């Protein structure tokens, strides 16, 4: 079932900085990563449209689309608009995944959530790709847009203790371990704009988000990042 599978797909961006073991980073990949970090780390808010593609050997390709909002510290709102309305919210401490047609909402502490979208809140943080990947190099994959390049990130398999304080977002997100093979990030090397993220998981499962129309530092209301379950909606705790 797609909903269950999405909760199992974790992003390389979840892994907190390590105290040791430097990543193997090619010079061109390092320059592209710096452009990406410079583009987003100073933004207080971000907004974009997204197209999600999920594929596995049993269900084939499924496509959804909507809008996503990010705000410091570690808050997100994913509004799915087509083909079905859904809502994924992180308020920095708790993540909620609400499907109105199911009359249920799944809830998890951010430190326990393995949903791969959760770590993307670090776009507005200070994490560096060179600290998050065991290997970071240029992929031979063709980019979707002219002028872009594709970074290939191989995740660190070991769990790591973060340098940051316990209440830091990087320290609070659940670590991942052997849940995916690689992450491909399509980036414009000049502007640093993130165009696409593709997570490749064992078993032929892939989850891809294509982003567009990025807007930075727009005024976003606090209420966007808080969820109140409507009357009659069952709250289900995500299994630990």
Residue spans of the language-model regions?
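Short, surface-exposed coil-to-beta transition loops
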Residues: 63-65, 83-84, 91-92, 178-182, ...
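Gly/Pro-enriched, hydrophobic low-complexity segments
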Residues: 129-232, 236-239
């Amino acid at each position: 079932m797609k909903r269950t599978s999405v909760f199992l797909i974790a992003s390389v961006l979840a892994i907190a900085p390590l105290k040791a073991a430097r990543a193997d980073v090619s010079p061109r990949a390092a320059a592209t990563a710096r452009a990406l970090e410079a583009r987003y780390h100073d933004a207080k808010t971000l907004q974009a449209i997204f197209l999600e593609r999920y594929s596995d050997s049993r269900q084939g390709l499924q496509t959804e689309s909507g809008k996503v909002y990010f705000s410091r510290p570690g808050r997100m709102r994913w509004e799915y608009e087509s083909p079905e309305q859904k809502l994924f919210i992180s308020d920095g401490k708790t993540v909620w995944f609400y499907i109105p047609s199911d009359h249920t909402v799944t809830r998890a502490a951010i430190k326990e959530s393995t949903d791969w979208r959760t770590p993307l809140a670090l776009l507005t943080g200070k994490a560096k790709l060179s600290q998050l990947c065991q290997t970071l190099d240029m992929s031979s994959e063709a980019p979707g847009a002219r002028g872009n390049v594709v970074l290939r990130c191989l995740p660190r398999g070991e769990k790591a203790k973060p340098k940051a304080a316990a209440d830091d977002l990087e320290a609070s997100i659940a670590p991942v371990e052997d849940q995916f093979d690689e992450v491909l990030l399509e980036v414009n090397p000049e502007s640093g704009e993130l165009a696409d993220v593709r997570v490749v998981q064992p078993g032929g499962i892939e989850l891809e988000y294509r982003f567009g129309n990025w807007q930075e530092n727009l005024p976003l209301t606090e209420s966007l990042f808080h969820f109140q379950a409507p009357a009659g909606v069952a709250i289900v705790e995500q299994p630990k």
